[in-house]
Amino acid sequence: MSPQWMPQNIQKRLLLYVLQQLSLFSEIDLPNLEEVSLNNIVLRDISIDPEKVGKLPGCNLRFGQVGTLELNTVTGGTIIGGGGGVNVDARDVEVVISPDFDINEEVRKEVQFSLAQSTADLAKTIIKDSDSAAEDESDDTDEEIVVEPKKSRSSSSSSFSGSTSKPSALSAVMSRAVEMALSRLQIKITNMKIKLVSEMTDLLFEVDEVLINTVNGTRVVKITGVRSMTLKPNVNPGELVEKVVQSPQKDDTSDNEEDDSNYEDDNNDYGDESLMDSMVFTHEEASSIYLSATSQSFPRPTSYNVDEGEVHVGNESVSSDPPAIFHMDYCDVEFDGLSNVSNLKIDIGTIKVATTPLAPTIISILNGITRSLKIKNHQKWTQQALKRQQNSRFPQYAETTDELTDDEASSKDGENTDPFFNKLHIRDIIISTTSALSRDGVFASPDNSINFVLHNSNIKQKNDMLIYGGVETFRIEQVKEGVTTDIFTFESPTAATHAEQSQSQPDSEGVSFAHGSPPPPIRPMSPSSISSMSSSGSKSSTLKADLRFEIFKKLEENVVTIETTALLSKTALLTLDLNSSLILSNFITAMNSIHSNFKVLMATIENLSKQQSPKKQKTHTNAAEAMTTKTQFILQTSPIIMSVKFTQDLLVKAIIFPISYNLQQNQLSISKILINTTIRNERESTTITISNIVLLTKLHEFKSFIKRIANPSNANPIPREVQVTASSNLFISKIMVNIALKELKFVISNIVSFYDSFASLSAKQSNSLENSVLDFVRDRSHKLEISSILQPPGQSRRRIGPGFASPHLSNPTFVNISRNNIASFRCSIKEVELNLVQVLPKFGGLTLRLKDILLYEQKNDINGSILSFDIVRVDDGQLQKFVYEFQELPLESIRLPLIMIHCKNTEKISTVDVVIRNVLVEYYTQWLLLLDDFEANEEKLAELVVEKVKPVNPSSSQNRFDIRFSVFDCIIGLNPGRLPCKSYLVVGRGTSDFTFGVNQFYIKSSFRDVSALLIDDVKNKEKMPLKDNSTSRSRKSLPTSSYTSPLTFFSNLGYIMIGGLNVVHIGITFNTNIEEVMKRNEKLGISDNLSLIDLKINSDEHHLELCADSTHVLLQLINDLKLPLNFKDDEKMKVTVDSSINLMDDLDENQFQLKKRNISVAPGVETSSSSAGSENENLETIAFDEDHFSKARNKIPKGSKVDPFKLNINLSKTKIYLYDGYDWKDTRKAVRGAVKRVEAQAMKERLKKLKKQTDKDDYDEEDEFIEETLFSSIHVGIPRDATDANLTDRINKRVQSSLQETDMTPEEAQKAQINVELGKNYKNLKLRRSRVHKIMADFTNIEVNVSVYSTRDPRKDPTDENLPYELLNDVEVRLGTADVYDNVATSTWNKLLTYMNTSGEGEIGKSMLKLAITNVRPSPKLVSSEAIMKVQVLPVRLHIDQDTLDFLMRFLEFKDSRFSLPLDEIVYIQKFQISPVMLKLDYKPKRVDYVGIRSGNSAEFMNFFILDGSTINLAEATVYGLLGMPSLGKALGEVWGPQIQQTQIAGILAGLAPIRSIVNIGGGVKDLIAIPISEYKKDGRLFRSIQKGTQKFAKTTGYEILNLGVKLASGTQVILEQGEQLLGGEGSGARLPASRGSNSQKCNVNKRSSYKVAAKVDFNKLLANSQVLNQSVRVDRDQYANKKFYSYIDIDEDDDELVTGIDKELLSKSIFLLPRDDNSKKEGEEDEADDSSADEEGEKLISLYSNQPENIQEGMKLAYKSFGNNLKITKRQLINLKNELNESENIQDSLKSILKSSPIIFIRPIIGSTEALSKALMGLGNEIDSKRIVESRDKYRYIKRAKDEDVL
């Protein structure tokens, strides 16, 4: 214990020393000396001299003033502890300081040893004075006080530290005495104000009282009433009672501006040079400068007012002081020692913080420090550069310094075993998020506020190795309407424990602990031990604090580990609503902004530390090599329960299982998160379960896929796999969601409503960062200042000083890693399962499974992928797949992700790019029956999509948001509701863009390479496994190059390709703001009606390839893809009436008296005709208006009505190929069975005839034919006396057309190989699809326009009583051109149907067919509708061959009972109108069905006559009241039948071939007389009239005579060719070219080449047999040649021989054309043979009238050429005869050869003569009438000629 006395001498010397220190103040005048005595000195209004104070650490003193300073000495017993001492009492202290970041070593050492220097000076003074005059101490002290100005503190320090003389014993004693004297020094400071000024921030600190003294050798510092206020920037103080934001008045604003102007120079020059360094001034100058600079430094009471009155809080008015950010009621500090402080104890009372003004203040401080450090570093770098230049002669001394390093200095200090820190205790910390803070520490607005409360916080240090502590209570409380509730708290202990806690007792050291004793220290433990400890149920666990932690230092060899463990052992409860979420979100936003600015500051400090001197760096490097420091942080929590009340009806609770974090492992893990929902206060249910969450904060590599850029050579780019490294990685094992659809909609709607309210109210909160700075001053400088305060880090692109790059780019961890493959964050989810329970009552549920989900952020973009996903419908345990991978591969076999996502954000646009690959979406018609609730709410859904969509704010239109979908090899499966068939639409590639505009929402899509696949029965698919089973087994090992396309996959399953298209564009426009769009259209002059939804489809080229059975299946499938329309009788018609109806009231008695009316007629006009006309007029007035609905529609002004929906379809080119044969196995089996049955019946008949078991009469009564009819179109019949081969040959001839192999294109050969050669059929029956098509329809410019005017359902929606009728929709179909080509082998004609070119070229824009349908509802209350149809047709030219007609009838009449559907609601045609139709017909019969004639089929008589140019003109027809299309055909027949009989017989008979020329010549004679008469009546010129008539007569007569000659010559040629062929010659085959195609009717311009088909090929002979190596082959230009796929599998027989020994994929893609190998028949197959094994010797017939010359010159050339060709044939025959004669051995052989060749030798020149004559006559006739050549090209097939490139 210190002695309780002090010698008088020491007291005097102490007072002398204190008086000497008064030189720190400016010169003291007499007015300042209020009282001076020996033991008491009182000074008033004195200023502190900044120059005498000198350099302070980290700051500069700008101004200092003490209101009252009293110094006195006291005798023992008057102060604490007894004994004498010195009291220093300062009141009203005001200090202004500015930060200085240029902290030199000299300043730091000076401050460190300042107290030791003062002690040494005092000791010297005592020793010196005691030796000279010890007896006169008091007098000498009074008279000899001479204060010499010190040169500098550094010199004193140097002299003190540099003294090497050995101290005397008296000196040590006196130093001890000085220590004793200083221990009796008591300092008391009252009402101290410290203002911290900087360039961006001004702060004011106020302290009510500071008391410093020593008690029992312990230094005690007591601080009372500490508060901090922000002067600059002008921040929002927070909410007051009335929530009025304070604003400065004009007078105070001018004062503040004056203050800012006073400091403007200092702020501008602050970064470069301080005021103390740049000026040398006297005390008077300094005083004047600082007084002027600080005259208004401290705020006045009138600086802040609210409006014109005062806002009261309770009974006290709100202080008009600056915004307070901090208040502390008291702080007690105790420590031992002076130069070496130890055993530090801090006890703090209550701390209150207002975050509303605090956040912008801290941000401003951090930005200011960062800026100052950068400027100082730039100055230091410049000085070092100059210093290096000055020491260039002695570079080894450039960085030399004599100063001691930190380690050396610390080694010289005496070691102190006592720890520096002992404990810290804070009673309460209260942080308010919204309320303002008053001067006295009371929150100005406690209502509607959220406070963070930390109660009883303790930190203790047990020894140098362990620091522990905790927070007893942590909670977040909300004050609302005077009621305080906890929104965050920890679980409360038991009641008994709570009673114990309420009786807290102080510990032995005076610090109160809640549990009566300090918490035990936490030992270093693993997370598992912490978890077990927290989960224990002992009583001690309930007494633990809410938060506990320990810091443990562990030494192991050269490694120092500092381990920090934090434990939250209680369950946390968090409850949020809209108000609390708003406040907390703004609070978190402010904290994040502070953290971001702090990170920038730390990065700047780190860069500064790297620029230290090399010597210091070397010293630290050596120390680092000797000792390594590691940091470990472990966090363990208990479960956290968070509840969010979105609305009154929705409560969401999240249960977060214990959280564990390990810093060394960089891993945070959560075992599970449960999210429960409570809807409408009902039972709580678990909705979301998240399992195994792991967060890694270290580098981790992973694989990802990136999208390749598509190019024309690679239509389906395979994504590229890359390696990516992420610094943060989040792993989630599984996310499972279980919720009903209604609940999901309810939850989403409530969350959206919550979000909208949150977004609209967030910026309006007083504690938001945007409202934290009050920008009342509108000048530019303040705006820039405030924007710089709140500017988030990283946005400033200005670089200040060298070496200050972004801290993220300078991370040494990323060295040697490509920045292109670095991701900042990665999220990997193994599986996500969403179970939508009870989507609809009848529908069941949907299950969505996503597997291997990857999301990562790279270069501010978000990339991601989903490896696999599927959607399944679940109903009563049954699964129905909806969306899935088309091959249904297991997860480990999938090599490419099904979905890839790329999100790119820029300043103007945000784009989300989604790539979907190999996804199959199933459409089920049955689902439409299950979606009753969806259909019931269809109108509401339309309103939600269109009408309820709010227009986008124009201001936000700059930040556009687009979504783009790209699809590759995606499939749409079409499943009809009642049929077993199925179809797939395969999309090769496509894109779809979603654009959100201001007034409209757009969807623009483009799809390419779309193909359609079809199968008749899905059971057939299931029975057909893949050919190569090894493919699926080894798929995992295959690279991405072995990609299987959907076309290949489904073709192997038995599907056939029925068509496709190359490109289709789809555009959908949703008009969300109709009014604005209408205004825009008015300005642009657009008068069309608007629609809510506008759909446009534009497609380029299409093709369909169908057989009769596949066509029937396709049509029935399309019909079954919609719900059947069946209405009840009371819905279609009014079956009951409200009142009785008297039919007699509607009868008009004068109805039949109209004919007897006397009508006056004009003179000279016959009465009968006038009467008839009048009667017709009267009758017409009684009839209803035929155009009533169309006129009503036309009355609607354009642009004044908004339609619900519009559809526009435009198809550029469409080709339909009709094939003979059958695609389906069941059809072929049925035909084969019928053939067997017919043959069996025929066999029985032959047996009966041979055994003569039947009578002759009975046999005659039986039918001549044995026949059977299948599918309503296939007639299998055989004469009773015929053989099996006759039936088989006839079927094969009709189906396969008996084509030679040389007549097919390579494409047709490939299809024939696939369809025919791979299978065997009964008795050589060729029932598969024919090798070539029989009919091809070519349509161009098909346009369909649909306008929907009403979607109202009278059964559900109300009906307007005043509505007389209701227009439903308009449908308009236009067909530009139509050409139907005849490709039947036995037909010689080209076009079956085309435009009549002889009537002149069609008008531009005129459609060949136009169909307009208007659907109306006559009674708006009934659901039934009626159709009004109008048809317009251009003149049509028909060339009908009987074989072609039979094929069409057989094709179109095909019906399979397996695909029959009940009839839907039959369309009622109210009115049908067709315009006049002009027909010109050519008909060529081949045979006559006499059986049909005998059965009464009168139409069969047409087959007796050949028609050539018969004309039929059908007048306009209008019919009414038709039920269905069959009734329409019957009605038209009744209308046109009498007209044809009365007026068109002459035109038909004029086309009879025998009399055609006579009729035409007769027409010429008529023209010879009729034309001159008409012309003469017209102009009166006789000669010209006769000339015109003569020319017409000569032209007609001449052409007909020449045409007659051509027919005679051609007939003669045909007879001669047939005779030659009978005698062994070539016949008509000589006219055919050696190599030609058979497909000219497609476009009449394509080039074909000869080919041969491969049946079974030896792979070893592939190259040797290739025609590519033998001769040139013309390339097939058919654009569909490579797109036609058919099944490679024969499903008819079980013993099919498949092609082996060759890669089938190579064969299908090869350009080689191989020869046939006929030896492919298996042994033992006597009754079955290959389809291709039959002899096919038939030819495609070519007419002699084809390839007609256009003029006489060309005719002569062709005549010469044809005659030469025939002479060449004769020459060749003569050469052959000569060779045979030379080879003959006897005269008989010679005569035989001569007799065989002579007819051919003599006939062939005659054939050449007739052919030459016909060609010459054709050329002459076509030159006379050039229109005939146009007709001939449309009518006849063309073969290739040597002159041009026309081909068949």
UniProtKB/Swiss-Prot annotation:
- Alphabetized GO MF terms: phosphatidylinositol-3-phosphate binding; protein-membrane adaptor activity
Q: What is its main location?
A: membrane
For bias type Low complexity, the affected ranges are 154-168, 525-540
Biological process (GO), any one: reticulophagy
* Keyword Oxidoreductase attached: no
Q: What does this protein do?
A: Lipid transfer protein required for autophagosome completion and peroxisome degradation. Tethers the edge of the isolation membrane (IM) to the endoplasmic reticulum (ER) and mediates direct lipid transfer from ER to IM for IM expansion. ATG2 binds to the ER exit site (ERES), which is the membrane source for autophagosome formation, using basic residues in its N-terminal region (NR) and to the expanding edge of the IM through its C-terminal region. The latter binding is assisted by an ATG18-PtdIns3P interaction.
Q: What is this protein called?
A: Autophagy-related protein 2
Source lineage:
Eukaryota, Fungi, Dikarya, Ascomycota, Saccharomycotina
